[in-house]
């Protein structure tokens, strides 16, 4: 673990495995990892190096142990830590961190946070156990946790249980502060105290489930916020003092333990799960999801700016923008602060995510340059005590070094090490080398002993085999004995060598000490054999102890006499250490190297004798009076050394005695064992002899039996003998062949070694060659990139020079004009000419100003000088005319001064111009480079889409081939054609993959060039500017911005103009095709071949409607209009059906088409403006003509606004007043013609002042009148009743597929549900009431009140005349035949209450009763006998004849939100349910329905969010979801037929069918109604039905009803004339047209 100081941020890269969807779509892997190196390659040769790199197959445990485990250990030492997970959405960040809890997650797949929690509490338990074992006070730990969520730049507390999820958008009270040390902390955050691992895991799970997630096109469950899970660890542990060097310094007596104190360490661990960076066009996010994505990207951008500022190697950036985002503010400690930080960058390996992967790797690469300042979080008292202890230990160590002579002070006062210390270091090094040598020799001796044992055992076995009485047991016993004998022999030799060494040491000590009297006789005692008596050894030890006591007493007397005992003590100790080291080295050498070092021992003994002689002489010379003091000191030192030697000798002798005692015990044990064996053998011998003696008295029969037994055993032994002899021969033969085998083995080994050497050399050569090729290729690529870069620079320079040339030409033109003006000034003129000229100066001045305005921006100063010269000339003329007598001199000087100023400022303007040109070139380079990258990205995306299309087509062909093989295997020609088509598609896919790879390589090269350009920072140029130059640069920037803005506006205007023309051309062609098709249909009855032609065209056009065309109608697809599609290949698919349609229709003979159309028909094929005029005037064609009257009755109308085409310019629309006047004028004409279409839908925002009812209900004082539903004669009560008022047509929606004819108003709050018959309409609202309407009279009949809360569902049973309304957990049953009263109340738990159970409820009920659940929807069986109520996650079945519950449908894990009922062919009910758990389930009920019934089928795959609505027509089921998508299912095959992911911009709330037509209606929360073709599930048109969300939709035989949150129900008519089998492209273009015949 790194200590205190600077610590770089570590970066790890994890590459997730490919998804199955990516594999199916043919995505290639664009990343690779260098084996054994933390390096990842992107594309071909773009390499990134990090601290850790984890490839596709890396497990979670490896990531944790490599990256995070050390950080947890650092937390116990007081270091902060942070783990950051960064990457694009869907890259596996949440999986890596472990915050996405799933029931199916195994232990191996646990993320970083659960593993860190287990590690943390395991470390706490281990430290407490270790302290208990050591007998010290255990540390105390306090763990707390916080869980924050940063959602849309608002900090939310995920542990706050009182927070309402609906208040997510409100501002939180959490504040971020900074303490005195620069640390970041938050206030207002819930901090939970944790006591166990399970408790912390539960808190993590609770917070993770409260986190904001949603589904996008890239990820089913995408994190929509940044999450920060923080663990605070507070540790109070015992801090022991370090062992001081000298006990005298510490002052502690012997046996006193060192004092202990407590220190407090704190640490915090941040686990940061960042939300993924995302592109809106990839995720398909709209509305709230788009806002979340923008907020996420803003936070990550701020984080990137902070990383760039901290990782700047040049240290130019002074300010770090931590406060730009709350995310960077919270992570201020982790980035550049006090924390050990690791960033885990999660990337996708697929080539479709190449740009996101590249940006993530660049992002992470910048983070490696950040340096954090890591310190231990310790309380101040503990820090001060630790610092003082460290200082004391340092000073004590230094003092001991001075005392020991290790450090010395030189003459100049400098510190250094003594020669003794250096000598000791050398000796220690030599000692280490000798130890290694001894160890190696010991291993060699052991190997030799083993070999000797083996050979001797083999020899003994051979001897026994020759004798014929050997077996395996005896051989094993012999081998064990031999091994034991060798071991004992080795130990004996070691003991003898040690004894010899001890004898030599004792003799040296006796020779060196004149005071030892009993040492010499001890040598013969030790010189005996190892079996000498223990009394002799005891006697030697006793004598040595007596000598030791005498020496100690002598030393005490000498110390009393010594005046400098401290100095002597120091010297004696030094000599003692040296002698100990010398003796130890000698003992080890003699013990381990007895064979090699005999001579060296003799020489050592001689040297030692000489040393002892010199020491004796030194002691004997003590009588010299002059050197008495010095000799006295030497004697004292020698005496001290001898005492130590004696002590050591005694210890060695005692150890040797103990070892001998141990050997004696071992020998005695073995002797006893052998004696026991001998005794057992003797007993067995006696027993056998006794048996033999007793055998003589046995009978003949027993003798024969024993004889037979012995003969049998003898035969067996003979067979064993033969086998042993054969084995012996084989053994002899093997011994003979052993030498030959050994020679062959050596030869083969030599050959193998040579081959290995050759292989190594060859591999080395191959590596060198590969490295050389790689270097050459890299060099060539670099040269190519350099050349390309140089070429681009040259092109930019040429462009800049051309621009500079044009500017110079303009300046030259301006100078020429100035020169000509000056020449005109110098030319003399007559008074008449001057008089005429006096009339013209204003024109001349104006012309000069005009010319100045037409030149470039840099020529303005010259233009001003020309105009000043002209004004000067005017003043001179006025002087000649006598107007101004004085200003002659003043008229010429200003011009001269200006020219002087200009000459003085030439150098300044030149320098500023050069700086501006350099900046301009830099800007042009950056713009061109970014444009190139954007174009390459677009090309790569286009290729990826094309590859996906080809893969889908290839899969379809493969399935077709498999089906053809299964049905008719003999069709070889068809199979061959399909195989060829599949091969062609595979070749095309390979070609596209090559193109994608080239794009990736080019992008990488451009990114490298971009980095080089970024290195030349413009700040250097700007910082070197003076104030005047800066003003000039700012002025140039402003002018350039204005010019660019003007160019952009002009381009946009041109684009809009071209788009308008293109739309007009498309609509003209589609109108003509439509007219031709309609004309052909009329003639088709008499011409069968024409019918076949039309059918073929329709089939081909239906087949041509691909998924790309569907995207034109889908708001969430790749584009919202065909003008946004930039690829040429995409445009090829758009019009592929129209030329074929036109060509086939034009090929039909004129006879089939009948008479030609007149001039009024041709007007329809004109532009959109002419069509609008024809429609608005109403006289564009003859209505009397029956042909046109019949054609107009089948008018085609499609939406003009929506997702099909972009909105047209507002400048082309007429004002509302003009349209209202034209509508009023055209109204009488339309009312007289029966052939025209009914009134179209109302405008988007109808005027509320026309509605008397809404004006009256807006007054709160009259709110009580709303509850009156009686038939009073009061006019006020009649007005307050709900009415259905007709709605006039509006031009804005005349081309829509639906036209609003009426509007029902009467509810005061949003309408949630409705049901209708041909005469009655029933509505339920949030105002706790239901209303019944008469569709014939257009009035409200009755109001059904008394509901506890919102009425969420209402159904009418035509068989019984009962109405069922749902509110909270109650179903009210109303009998409308008598007086519209509630006759029964049904509950969700299955209870039946007579009458109205909620009549006493006056206020709105918020909660349900105990045991009850919210009922979301009800449905009636087609026969009217069963009622199905969706309550909770089940559906309760009611039998209406008895009003009793009979069963329950179960199987969902979430609340059932919607259901629908139909009948099968066997007249059984088929119930389909949709739940919040994203699944659609089907239940088929039999005749007897009782108990709990499970689903018969689960429709797969599920939606990405909860199901909101269902609709069934025949065998087709449609389901609409909150994920904005609609799916089409086949009930017979029970499979998914088709799906449109983004059918609407918001939740799909309602589905219904247009009666009698194969058309589906869908409505969403955005208020949009869409019409779909049921057969091929293609859009026909759409209309903005309401400004508020549409909650329900139903139909009857005449009308379509939509209920909305704007408190209204609109009645719609379908506009006839749309043909669902027409090509979608034609239908989409017709949506822009008006009424077409």
UniProtKB/Swiss-Prot annotation:
It comes from Homo sapiens (Human). Keywords: ATP-binding, Cell projection, Coiled coil, Cytoplasm, Cytoplasmic vesicle, Cytoskeleton, Microtubule, Motor protein, Nucleotide-binding, Phosphoprotein, Repeat, WD repeat. GO terms for biological process: microtubule-based movement. The gene is KIF21B. GO terms for molecular function: ATP binding; ATP hydrolysis activity; microtubule binding; microtubule motor activity. The keyword Ribonucleoprotein does not apply. This is Kinesin-like protein KIF21B. Residues 578-627 have a biased composition (Acidic residues). Interacts with TRIM3; the interaction positively affects motility of KIF21B. Interacts with GABARAP and GABA(A) receptor subunits: GABRG2, GABRA1 and GABRA2. May interact with GABA(A) receptor subunits: GABRB2 and GABRB3. InterPro entries: KIF21A/B_hel_1, KIF21A/B_hel_2, Kinesin-like_fam, Kinesin_motor_CS, Kinesin_motor_dom, Kinesin_motor_dom_sf, P-loop_NTPase, WD40/YVTN_repeat-like_dom_sf.
């Amino acid at each position: 673990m790194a200590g205190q100081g600077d610590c770089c941020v570590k970066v790890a890269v994890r590459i997730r495995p490919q998804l199955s969807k990516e594999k199916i779509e043919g995505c290639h892997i664009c990343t690779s990892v260098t084996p054994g190196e933390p390096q990842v390659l992107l594309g071909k040769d773009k390499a990134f190096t990090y601290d850790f790199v984890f490839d596709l197959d890396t497990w979670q445990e490896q990531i944790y142990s490599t990256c995070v485990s050390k950080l947890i250990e650092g937390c116990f030492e007081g270091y902060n830590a942070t783990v950051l997970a960064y990457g694009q959405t869907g890259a596996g960040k949440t999986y890596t961190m472990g915050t996405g809890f799933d029931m199916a997650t195994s232990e191996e797949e646990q993320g970083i946070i659960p593993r860190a929690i287990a590690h943390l509490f395991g470390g706490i338990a281990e430290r407490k156990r270790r302290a208990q074992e050591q007998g010290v006070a255990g540390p105390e730990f306090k763990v707390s946790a916080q869980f924050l969520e940063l959602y849309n730049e608002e900090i939310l507390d995920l542990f706050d249980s009182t927070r309402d999820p609906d208040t997510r958008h409100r501002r939180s009270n959490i504040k971020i502060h900074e303490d005195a040390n620069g640390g970041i902390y938050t206030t207002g955050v819930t901090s939970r105290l944790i006591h166990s691992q399970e408790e912390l895991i539960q808190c993590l799970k609770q917070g993770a489930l409260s986190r904001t997630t949603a589904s996008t096109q890239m990820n089913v469950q995408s994190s929509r916020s940044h999450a920060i899970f923080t663990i605070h660890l507070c540790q109070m542990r015992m801090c022991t003092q370090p062992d001081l060097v000298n006990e005298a310094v510490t002052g502690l007596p012997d046996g006193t333990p060192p004092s202990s104190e407590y220190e407090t360490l704190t640490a915090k661990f941040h686990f940061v799960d960042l939300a993924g960076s995302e592109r809106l066009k990839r995720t398909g996010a709209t509305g709230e999801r788009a806002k979340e994505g923008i907020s996420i990207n803003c936070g990550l951008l701020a984080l990137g700016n902070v990383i760039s500022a901290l990782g700047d190697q040049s240290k130019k950036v002074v300010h770090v923008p931590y406060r730009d985002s709350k995310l960077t503010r919270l992570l201020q400690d982790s980035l550049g602060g006090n924390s050990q930080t690791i960033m885990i960058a999660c990337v996708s390996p697929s080539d479709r995510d190449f740009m996101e992967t590249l940006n993530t790797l660049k992002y992470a690469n910048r983070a490696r340059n950040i340096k954090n300042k890591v310190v231990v979080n310790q309380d101040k008292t503990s820090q001060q005590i630790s610092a003082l202890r460290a200082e004391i230990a340092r000073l004590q160590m230094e003092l001991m070094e001075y005392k020991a002579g290790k450090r010395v002070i030189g003459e100049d006062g400098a510190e250094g090490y003594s020669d003794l210390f250096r000598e000791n270091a050398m000796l220690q090094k030599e000692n280490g080398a000798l130890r290694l040598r001894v160890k190696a020799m010991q291993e060699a001796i052991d190997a030799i002993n083993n070999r000797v044992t083996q050979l001797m055992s083999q020899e003994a076995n051979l001897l026994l085999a020759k004798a014929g009485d050997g077996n395996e047991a005896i051989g094993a016993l012999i081998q064990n004995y031999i091994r034991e004998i060798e071991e004992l022999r080795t130990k004996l030799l070691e003991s003898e060598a040690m004894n010899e060494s001890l004898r030599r040491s004792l003799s040296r000590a006796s020779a060196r000490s004149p005071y030892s009297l009993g040492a010499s006789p001890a040598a013969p005692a030790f010189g005996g054999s190892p079996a000498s008596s223990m009394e002799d050894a005891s006697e030697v030890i006793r004598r040595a102890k007596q000598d030791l006591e005498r020496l100690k007493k002598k030393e005490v007397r000498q110390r009393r006499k010594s005046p400098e005992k401290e100095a002597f003590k120091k010297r004696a100790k030094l000599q003692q250490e040296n002698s100990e080291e010398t003796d130890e080295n000698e003992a080890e050498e003699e013990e381990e190297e007895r064979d090699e070092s005999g001579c060296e021992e003799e020489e050592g003994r001689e040297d030692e004798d000489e040393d002892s002689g010199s020491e004796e002489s030194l002691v004997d010379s003590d009588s010299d009076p002059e050197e008495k003091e010095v000799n006295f000191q030497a004697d004292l030192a020698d005496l001290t050394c001898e005492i130590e030697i004696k002590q050591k000798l005694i210890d060695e002798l005692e150890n040797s005695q103990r070892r001998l005692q141990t050997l004696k015990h071992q020998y005695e044990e073995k002797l006893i064992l052998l004696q026991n064996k001998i005794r057992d053998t003797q007993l067995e011998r006696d027993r056998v002899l006794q048996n033999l003696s007793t055998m003589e008295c046995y009978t003949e029969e027993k003798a024969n039996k024993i004889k037979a037994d012995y003969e049998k055993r003898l035969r067996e032994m003979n067979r064993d003998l033969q086998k042993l002899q054969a084995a012996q021969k084989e053994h002899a033969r093997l011994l003979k062949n052993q030498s030959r085998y050994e020679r062959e083995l050596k030869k083969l080994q030599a050959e193998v070694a040579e081959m290995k050497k050759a292989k190594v050399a060859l591999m080395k050569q191959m590596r060198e060659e590969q490295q050389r090729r790689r270097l050459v290729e890299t060099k060539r690529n670099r040269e190519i990139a350099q050349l390309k870069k140089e070429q681009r620079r040259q092109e930019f320079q040429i462009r800049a020079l051309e621009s500079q040339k044009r500017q110079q030409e303009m300046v030259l033109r301006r100078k020429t004009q100035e020169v000509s003006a000056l020449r005109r000034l110098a030319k003399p003129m007559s008074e008449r000419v001057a008089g005429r000229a006096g009339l013209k100066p204003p024109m001349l001045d104006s012309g000069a100003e005009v010319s100045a305005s037409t030149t470039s921006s840099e020529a303005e100063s010259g233009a001003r000088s020309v105009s000043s010269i002209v004004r000067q000339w005017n003043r001179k003329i006025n002087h000649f005319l006598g107007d101004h007598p004085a200003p002659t001199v003043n008229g010429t000087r200003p011009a001269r001064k200006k020219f002087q100023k200009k000459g003085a400022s030439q150098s300044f303007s030149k320098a500023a111009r050069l700086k501006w040109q350099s900046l301009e070139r830099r800007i042009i380079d950056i713009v061109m480079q970014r444009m190139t990258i954007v174009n390459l990205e677009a090309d790569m995306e286009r290729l990826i889409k094309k590859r996906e299309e080809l893969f889908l087509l290839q899969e379809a062909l493969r399935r077709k081939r498999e089906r053809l093989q299964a049905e008719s295997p003999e069709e070889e020609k068809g199979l061959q054609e399909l195989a060829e088509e599949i091969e062609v598609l595979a070749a095309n896919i390979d070609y596209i993959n090559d193109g994608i790879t080239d794009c990736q390589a080019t992008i990488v090269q451009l990114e490298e060039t971009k980095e080089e350009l970024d290195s030349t920072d413009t700040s250097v140029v700007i910082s070197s500017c003076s104030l005047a130059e800066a003003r000039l640069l700012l002025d140039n920037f402003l002018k350039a911005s204005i010019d660019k803005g003007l160019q952009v506006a002009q381009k946009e205007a041109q684009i809009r103009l071209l788009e308008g023309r293109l739309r007009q051309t498309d609509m003209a062609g589609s109108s003509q095709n439509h007219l031709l098709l309609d004309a052909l249909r009329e003639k088709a009855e008499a011409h069968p071949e024409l019918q076949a032609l039309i059918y073929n065209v329709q089939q081909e056009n239906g087949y041509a409607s691909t998924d790309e065309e569907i995207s034109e109608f889908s708001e969430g697809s790749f584009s919202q209009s065909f003008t946004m599609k930039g690829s040429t290949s995409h445009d090829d698919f758009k019009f592929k059906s129209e030329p074929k349609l036109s060509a086939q229709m034009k090929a039909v003979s004129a006879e089939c088409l009948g008479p030609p159309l007149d001039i009024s028909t041709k007007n329809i094929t004109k532009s959109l403006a002419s069509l609008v005029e024809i429609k608005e005037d109403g006289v564009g064609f003859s209505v009397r003509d029956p042909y046109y009257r019949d054609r107009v009755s089948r008018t085609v109308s499609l939406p003009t606004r929506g997702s099909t085409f972009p909105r047209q310019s507002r400048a082309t629309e007429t004002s509302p007043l003009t349209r209202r006047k034209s509508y009023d004028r055209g109204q009488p004409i339309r009312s007289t013609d029966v052939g025209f279409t009914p009134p179209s839908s109302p405008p988007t925002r109808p005027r509320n002042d026309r509605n008397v009812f809404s004006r009256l209900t807006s007054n709160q004082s009259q709110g009580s009148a709303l509850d009156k539903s009686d038939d009073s004669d009061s006019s006020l009560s009649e007005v307050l009743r709900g009415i259905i008022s007709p709605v006039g047509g509006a031009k804005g929606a005349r081309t829509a597929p639906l036209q609003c004819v009426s509007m029902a108003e009467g509810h005061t709050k949003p309408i949630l549900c409705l049901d209708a018959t041909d005469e009655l309409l029933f509505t339920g609202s949030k105002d706790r009431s239901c209303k019944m309407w008469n569709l014939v009279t257009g009035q409200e009949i009755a109001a059904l009140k008394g509901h506890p809360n919102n009425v969420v569902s209402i159904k009418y049973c035509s068989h019984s005349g009962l109405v069922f309304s749902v509110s909270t957990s109650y179903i009210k049953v109303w009998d409308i035949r008598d007086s519209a009263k509630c006759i029964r109340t049904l509950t969700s738990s299955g209870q039946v209450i007579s009458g109205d159970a909620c009549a006493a409820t006056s206020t709105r009920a918020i909660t349900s009763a105990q045991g009850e659940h919210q009922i979301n929807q009800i449905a009636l069986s087609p026969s009217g006998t069963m009622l199905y109520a969706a309550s909770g996650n089940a559906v309760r079945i009611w039998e209406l004849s008895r009003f009793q519950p009979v069963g329950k449908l179960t199987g969902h894990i979430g609340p059932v939100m919607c259901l629908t009922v139909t009948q099968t062919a066997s007249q059984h009910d088929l119930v389909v349910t949709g739940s919040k758990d994203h699944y659609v389930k089907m239940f088929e009920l039999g005749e007897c329905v009782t108990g709990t019934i499970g689903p018969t089928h689960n429709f797969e795959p599920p939606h990405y969010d909860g199901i909101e609505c269902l609709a069934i027509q025949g065998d087709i089921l449609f389901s609409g979801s909150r994920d904005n998508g609609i799916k089409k299912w086949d009930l017979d095959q029970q499979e998914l037929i088709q799906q449109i992911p983004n059918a609407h911009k918001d939740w799909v709330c309602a589905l219904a069918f247009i009666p009698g037509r194969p058309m589906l209606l869908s409505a969403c929360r955005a208020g949009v109604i869409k019409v779909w073709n049921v057969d091929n599930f293609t859009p026909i048109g759409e209309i903005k039905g309401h400004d508020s969300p549409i909650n329900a939709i139903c139909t009857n035989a005449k009308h379509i009803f939509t209920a909305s949150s704007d408190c209204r129900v609109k009645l719609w008519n379908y506009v006839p004339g749309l043909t669902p089998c027409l090509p979608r492209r034609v239908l989409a273009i017709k949506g822009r047209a008006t009424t077409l015949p």
